Design a protein with these regions (language model features):
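Helix-turn-helix
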Residues: 8, 16-54
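Short, basic, alpha-helical segments at the C-terminal edge of helix-turn-helix-like DNA-binding modules
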Residues: 57-63
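Secondary-structure edge/capping motif, primarily at the C-terminal ends of alpha-helices
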Residues: 67-70, 98-105, 133, 137, ...
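C-terminal peripheral helix-coil segments that are non-catalytic and often amphipathic
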Residues: 162, 166-208
Length: 208
């Protein structure tokens, strides 16, 4: 029973954080939503940051898996697309972390350090994939262009939801889809003609 209550708290908290924004949700709101006493909630979690750290652990596992590139061969466009899809799916499921990123990290040093590690790994992976595409002959780009493209990919992926919210987008799933396409379009100018046609085909299939 206690385990079920703990999971119900996590499920309700994640839904409320994602839909209402983490700063707007208190532990009392969560307890009211579940029709349990605040004391019952505190039996399982010391405070709201304790709940957030539980989510961050799941986010880290998902993101680490998404950032794992194919081994033993050079990347292809499909690899980039799949990796972006997994990354943006993770961002969608834990979107409150990104939408309220500055507020959450400003008050929790542990999460700030852990998020910095994720960003560092994502940066390294983006550079590795871009260099792999260039090495495979899929991209024609100088070393500075490859590095700039990798950095731009990371910036857009990290802050796309914030940008979409600022411009008033209501459909966050569509915003995620648009973010993936936007990232892929950063690569398009550097692709060979045949690969650019292939990318356009992938994009149309994804948007349909």
């Amino acid at each position: 029973m206690a385990r079920q209550t703990r999971q119900r708290i996590l499920d309700a908290s994640l839904s409320m954080f994602n839909t209402q924004g983490e700063p707007n949700v208190t532990t009392n709101h969560i307890a009211d939503e579940l029709e349990i006493s605040p004391g019952n909630l505190y039996y399982h979690f010391r405070n709201k940051d304790d709940i957030i750290e539980q989510f961050f652990g799941g986010y880290e596992q998902r993101m680490d898996a998404a950032l794992t590139a194919p081994s033993g061969r050079l990347p292809e466009l499909e690899d980039v697309w799949l990796q972006l899809h997994l990354v943006f799916e993770c961002i969608w499921d834990y979107r409150f972390l990104y939408r309220d990123l500055v507020d959450i990290l400003s008050r929790n040093r542990r999460l700030r350090m852990r998020f910095a590690r994720i960003l560092k790994r994502a940066d390294e992976q983006a550079h590795k994939v871009m260099r792999g595409l260039a090495q495979a002959g899929i991209m024609r780009a100088s070393a500075p262009e490859v590095d700039a493209a990798a950095t731009n990919i990371l910036v857009i992926a990290t802050f796309w939801l914030n940008y979409a919210a600022a411009r008033g987008d209501k459909d966050e799933r569509a915003s995620i889809r648009d973010g993936i396409v936007q990232v892929m379009m950063l690569i398009a100018p550097f692709l060979r003609d045949a690969e650019r046609v292939h990318l356009n085909t992938l994009t149309r299939a994804y948007l349909d």
